């Protein structure tokens, strides 16, 4: 690991938006290496409390006074240019670096950077691969976009040349990385508040491919038509995977009573080994194939790959079993894009239940608006849909789109759908209507998980 780009280990580094999952991970890596760290966020959280316990100075709220001792400021793409800490940094000539730049510079200190990109599945695949790498004893540094039990959080600092991280395409952040193994799980229309259209997104992924050195590897889902159209841009080793085609394939797929896949792994029409997943759905078969490809490209042993895959039981907020109440199961999932919702509901359909209640909180006004038609078609596997208000995240309500409009379209299509403004009202509705053997599935990238927790903790 090298921090040459920081120049001086005595420097004080301040993070604006330190409570974010990636920012907190970077801060934790620096704390581990004895840097002086501070950070600000709008709200206190378990993440900020954990960083405080590790020695970081945490400020709640953004104020210019927060940066007075900083030598370097790291900020997220969600931070606006009129943020008082950004303004103060510019006035005081304090060096500014966005999160992606900082992470990219950090990656320069490693030889085997594994950057996992794609519209969907990054956190799960990064987590699954982390299990494989730890079983293989490669002692990786890991930065993942979720909490992973095996590393007791979202970051692990290793001593080897292996660095495993997610590579998010939002605002082309991943183009600042230095992948030795670049992974593309899928390409779909998303972040249309930044990208013009799907072609613009594909162009960004095409540039990502070109970052991989000639002796490196592109691992890609070969059955994704959007990936197929850009894979020719690769000037490196290419490994494709899929169900029906690709260098690495899953054959003889069977699902157990919890919708988890068991299958044989084939390479060039020769069976390598069999795997039994402990996470549900076809999408996780594909995620596991990506992890297997990376393991094989990294010369990891088959037994370590198998043990790593089979020891993975999921990450927090990814088809996470929250508990049972009166024989009613509550599961939470981070899905917030129509494709992800469809995959989650498809997995849930195979899960044992009588009636499925899907409690969905749309995430951001821009995504709800630009993908509105797709949102009206992704809930068909749910028996009943409950919609919360849109979670604004980094955006402001312009009055153009709201959750009731989505509910109206779903009802027009003949789906049973009810809108609520308050989580308490959703909880009370579930108390009255969910029966023995039913499944409650909370879905969304905001705070909709709280509904499931409220229900469980009655």
Swiss-Prot record:
Major place of residence: cytoplasm
Residues that coordinate or bind ATP: 118-124
A molecular function GO annotation: UDP-N-acetylmuramate-L-alanine ligase activity
The enzyme's E.C. designation: 6.3.2.8
BP-aspect Gene Ontology terms: cell division; cell wall organization; peptidoglycan biosynthetic process; regulation of cell shape
Matching Pfam families: Mur_ligase (PF01225), Mur_ligase_C (PF02875), Mur_ligase_M (PF08245)
Keywords annotated in UniProt: ATP-binding, Cell cycle, Cell division, Cell shape, Cell wall biogenesis/degradation, Cytoplasm, Ligase, Nucleotide-binding, Peptidoglycan synthesis
Main enzyme class: ligase
Gene Ontology CC annotations of this record: cytoplasm
Reactions listed under catalytic activity: UDP-N-acetyl-alpha-D-muramate + L-alanine + ATP = UDP-N-acetyl-alpha-D-muramoyl-L-alanine + ADP + phosphate + H(+)
Cellular compartment(s): Cytoplasm
Pathway it works in: Cell wall biogenesis; peptidoglycan biosynthesis
Transmembrane segments: none
Function noted in UniProt: Cell wall formation.
PANTHER family per UniProt: UDP-N-ACETYLMURAMATE--L-ALANINE LIGASE, UDP-N-ACETYLMURAMATE--L-ALANINE LIGASE-RELATED
Entry's family note: Belongs to the MurCDEF family.
Record-given protein name: UDP-N-acetylmuramate--L-alanine ligase
Gene that produces this protein: murC
């Amino acid at each position: 690991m090298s921090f040459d780009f920081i120049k001086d280990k005595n420097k004080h580094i301040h993070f604006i938006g330190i409570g974010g999952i990636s920012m907190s991970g970077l801060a934790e890596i620096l704390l581990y290496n004895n840097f002086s760290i501070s950070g600000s966020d709008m709200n206190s959280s378990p993440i900020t409390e954990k960083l405080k316990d590790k020695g970081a100075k945490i400020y709640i709220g953004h104020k210019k006074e927060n940066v007075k001792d900083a030598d370097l400021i790291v900020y997220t793409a969600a931070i606006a240019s009129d943020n008082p800490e950004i303004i103060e940094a510019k006035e005081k000539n304090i060096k500014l670096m966005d999160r992606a730049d900082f992470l990219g510079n950090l990656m320069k200190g490693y030889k085997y950077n594994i950057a996992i990109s794609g519209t969907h599945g990054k956190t799960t695949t990064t987590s699954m691969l982390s299990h494989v790498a730890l079983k293989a004893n490669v002692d990786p540094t890991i930065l993942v976009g979720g909490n992973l039990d095996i590393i007791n959080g979202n970051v692990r600092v290793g001593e080897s040349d292996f660095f495993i991280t997610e590579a998010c395409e939002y605002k082309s952040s991943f183009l600042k990385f230095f992948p030795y193994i670049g992974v593309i799980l899928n390409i779909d229309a998303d972040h249309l508040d930044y990208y013009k259209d799907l072609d613009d997104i594909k162009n960004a992924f095409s540039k990502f491919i070109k970052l991989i050195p000639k002796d490196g590897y592109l691992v890609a889902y070969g059955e994704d038509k959007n990936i197929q159209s850009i894979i020719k841009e690769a000037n490196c080793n290419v490994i494709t995977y899929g169900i029906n085609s690709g260098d690495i394939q899953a054959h003889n797929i069977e699902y157990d009573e919890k919708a988890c896949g068991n299958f044989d792994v084939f390479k060039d029409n020769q069976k390598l080994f069999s795997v039994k997943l402990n996470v549900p759905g076809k999408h996780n078969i594909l995620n596991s194939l990506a992890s297997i490809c990376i393991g094989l490209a990294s010369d990891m042993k088959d037994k370590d790959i198998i043990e790593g895959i089979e020891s993975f039981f999921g990450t927090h907020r990814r088809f996470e079993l929250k508990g049972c109440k009166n024989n009613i199961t509550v599961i939470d999932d981070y899905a917030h894009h129509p494709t992800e919702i469809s995959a989650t509901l498809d997995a849930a359909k195979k899960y044992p239940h009588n009636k499925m209640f899907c409690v969905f909180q749309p995430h951001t006004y821009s995504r709800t608006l630009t993908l509105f038609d797709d949102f009206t078609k992704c809930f068909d596997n749910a028996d009943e849909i409950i919609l919360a208000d849109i979670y604004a995240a980094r955006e402001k309500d312009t009055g153009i789109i709201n959750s009731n409009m989505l509910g109206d379209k779903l009802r027009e299509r003949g789906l049973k759908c009810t809108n609520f403004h308050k989580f308490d009202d959703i909880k009370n509705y579930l108390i009255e209507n969910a029966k023995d053997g039913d499944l409650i599935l909370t879905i969304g990238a905001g705070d909709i998980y709280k509904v499931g927790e409220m229900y469980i903790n009655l």
